[in-house]
């Protein structure tokens, strides 16, 4: 039975960082996006107004809290407050990218746990449910006192990766110990070997790869990470894999931030044949690497379409993965 959504009861809104993504989602759902105004005053203050009634409606509001992280976050908090004051029946905040996710614990004295603070702010603003995507650490889900769905996207990437590299001689690589769980999930799904990069981080945004744990010689390597910030981690990993005589190196990361000189570093990595393919999703709007054949953006609209349909029809979100993983295991 084909699922549908009643646009009179369920409305999707997008804020500034998720507009194109939501346009694609609404096209797939064959519904109209909700009408709203989001503006910024000369002093930087954010102004939000919803131009249609939200009373007694189930609302899904999309916003990636990506650079400028603080402005994006304030847009979302103010929008949620406006929806609550407009008597929305429920407010589901869908954050394709969750800023401050890396500040999820104290590593030194007198540090904040900012990820927990953001969770409290979203809850206090009036969100009834939060949807996160490939969150940096699973413990973030426990920071919320409201229901949280943590989505995974690897099954969407895998179709394209296998098409390019095939399964033969393919090894899944975690660029550090923190990503082992994520990489092992993919390796187990495809029944592939796993390798781990032994990495140390002497300072913020600086990574040094020391050693490879696992066999990568004459193998096609798939480096898997949740995000690319400055690119230091994956480029250092790619250099080490090349040194260990890997055949091809493909990088797959859900969130492409590409801060500082990341674009230049990756262009050099492409030219030097360090990295053969780089995949990110459109969880964050992508404006770099235009017309670069080694770079590809994977669309998450189909995933969010399925998620919204599950909410609208009171179905299990977990079933989405079970269905996709079963298909991958049978056909890949």
Swiss-Prot record:
Enzyme class per UniProt: transferase
Catalysed conversion reaction: D-ribose 5-phosphate + ATP = 5-phospho-alpha-D-ribose 1-diphosphate + AMP + H(+)
Pathway: Metabolic intermediate biosynthesis; 5-phospho-alpha-D-ribose 1-diphosphate biosynthesis; 5-phospho-alpha-D-ribose 1-diphosphate from D-ribose 5-phosphate (route I): step 1/1
Cofactor or coenzyme needed: Mg(2+)
GO biological process per UniProt: 5-phosphoribose 1-diphosphate biosynthetic process; purine nucleotide biosynthetic process; ribonucleoside monophosphate biosynthetic process
Superkingdom classification of source: Bacteria
A molecular-function term among this protein's GO annotations: ribose phosphate diphosphokinase activity
Alphabetical list of InterPro entries matching this protein: PRib_PP_synth_CS, Pribosyltran_N, PRibTrfase_dom, PRTase-like, Rib-P_diPkinase, Rib-P_diPkinase_bac
Residue sites binding Mg(2+) 2 per the record: 176
Regions that span the bilayer: none
Active site: 199
Keywords: ATP-binding, Cytoplasm, Kinase, Magnesium, Metal-binding, Nucleotide biosynthesis, Nucleotide-binding, Transferase
Chief place of localization: cytoplasm
SUPFAM superfamilies: PRTase-like (SSF53271)
Pfam families xrefs: Pribosyltran (PF00156), Pribosyltran_N (PF13793)
Entry's localization field: Cytoplasm
Enzyme Commission number(s) of this protein: 2.7.6.1
Note on how the cofactor is bound: Binds 2 Mg(2+) ions per subunit.
Disruption phenotype: Probably essential, it was not disrupted in a global transposon mutagenesis study.
Subunit relationships: Homohexamer.
Summary of the function given for this chain in its UniProt record: Involved in the biosynthesis of the central metabolite phospho-alpha-D-ribosyl-1-pyrophosphate (PRPP) via the transfer of pyrophosphoryl group from ATP to 1-hydroxyl of ribose-5-phosphate (Rib-5-P).
The protein's name: Ribose-phosphate pyrophosphokinase
Organism (species): Mycoplasma genitalium (strain ATCC 33530 / DSM 19775 / NCTC 10195 / G37)
């Amino acid at each position: 039975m084909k699922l549908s959504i009643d646009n009179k009861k369920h409305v999707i809104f997008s804020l500034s960082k998720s507009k194109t993504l939501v346009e694609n989602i609404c096209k797939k759902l064959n519904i109209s996006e909700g009408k709203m105004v989001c503006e910024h005053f000369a002093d930087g203050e954010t102004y939000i107004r919803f131009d249609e009634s939200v009373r007694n409606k189930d609302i899904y509001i999309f916003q990636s809290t990506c650079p400028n992280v603080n402005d994006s976050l304030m847009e979302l908090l103010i929008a949620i407050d406006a929806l609550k004051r407009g008597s929305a029946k429920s407010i589901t905040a869908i954050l394709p990218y969750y800023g401050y996710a890396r500040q999820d614990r104290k590593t030194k004295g007198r540090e904040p746990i900012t990820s927990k603070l953001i969770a409290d702010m979203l809850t206090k603003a009036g969100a009834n449910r939060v949807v996160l995507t490939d969150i940096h650490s699973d413990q973030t889900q426990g920071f919320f006192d409201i229901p949280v769905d943590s989505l995974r996207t690897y099954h969407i990437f895998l179709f394209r990766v296998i098409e390019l590299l095939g399964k033969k001689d393919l090894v899944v690589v975690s660029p550090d110990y923190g990503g082992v769980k994520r990489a092992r999930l993919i390796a187990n799904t495809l029944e592939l070997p796993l390798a781990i990069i032994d990495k140390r981080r002497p300072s913020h945004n600086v990574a040094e790869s020391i050693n490879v744990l696992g066999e990568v010689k004459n193998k096609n390597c798939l480096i898997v990470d949740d995000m690319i910030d400055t690119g230091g981690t994956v480029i250092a990993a790619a250099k080490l894999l090349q040194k260990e005589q890997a055949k091809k190196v493909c990088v797959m990361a859900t969130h492409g931030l590409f801060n500082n000189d990341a674009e230049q570093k990756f262009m050099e990595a492409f030219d030097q044949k360090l990295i053969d393919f780089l995949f990110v999703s459109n969880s964050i709007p992508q404006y770099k690497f235009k017309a670069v054949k080694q770079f590809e953006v994977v669309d998450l609209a189909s995933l969010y379409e399925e998620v919204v349909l599950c909410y609208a029809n009171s179905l299990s979100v977990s079933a989405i993965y079970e269905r996709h993983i079963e298909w991958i295991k049978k056909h890949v």
